[in-house]
Amino acid sequence: GDVYKRQMLYNIHSPLEQFEVVSLAYTEIPYFGHVALTNLGLYTIITVFFVLAFHILGFNHKIVPSRWSLSLESSFASVHGLVKSQVGAANERFLPFVYSLFFFLLFANLNGNIPYGFTVTTSAIVSMGLSVIVFIGVTILGLSIHKVHFFSFFVPAGTPLALVPFLAPIELISYLARALSLGVRLLANMAAGHSLMKILGGFLFSLFTSSFLISILTIVPFVIFIAIIVLEFAVSFIQAYVFCILTSSYIKDAIDLH
C-alpha cells in the first residue's frame, strides 16, 4: 500500500493532458469513411444544448417574469448595450451575431470548469477558427461598404507622402494580427487558468493523502484554491465579453474606417 501511494504521489501527469482531443467513439460510413466523435465534438454539442436550454427556459409569457426570464433579459440588455456603444445604434443588425457568439463562448468556457470536463475554447481549432472567421467577415464587410477606399484604412490621415511606404506595411501587419490576436487571447487565458487549477489540485491531493497533521494544515490553501476556482468562473465570463467587445470594435472600424 505504501509503495502504491508513493507511486501515485510521484506519478505527475502533465497539466496539458486535459486539452488533448481524443476519440470517444467512431464508425465507418459508406462514402464518408472513418467518422469519429471526439471530446471536442461532444462538448461543442453540449455547449449548444445548454445555450438553447437557457433560452427556452427563459422564454416566458407570464406577466410576472421568472428568474430564468430575468437572467435572460439582463444578459440580452448587456450584449445589446455593448453592441450599441461599440457599433452604434444604426448598426444593430450585427446584434444577433455578437449575441450568439457571446453565449457560445460563455457556456463553452463555463463547461470547462466542470470536473473532468473539456474546455472547447482551449482548442486552437475553435479559438483561432472563430478569430479568423471574425477577421474575414469584418474584412469582407469593409470591402463591400467602401470598395477600394477601404485600403485607406492602412494609411493614417495626414500622413506625409514620404512616410507612406513605411507606415502602410506597419498598419497592414497590425491589421492582419487581428486574425490571431482574438483567438490567442482567449486560448491563452483559458488554458493558463485550467493548467493552474490542475497543478494546484494535484498538489493539494498529495497533501491531503499524506499524514493527518499535514491534511489539517492543507485546509487553508484549499480555501484559497476554492477562491481561485471562483475567479476562473469570472474569467470565463470576462473572456467571452472581451471577445465580443473586440469583435464589435472591429465591425465599427470596418464601417467607419477608424
Spans of features found by a protein language model:
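Selective transmembrane helix interface/packing segments
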Residues: 5-258
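Positively charged, low-complexity/disordered segments
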Residues: 1-2
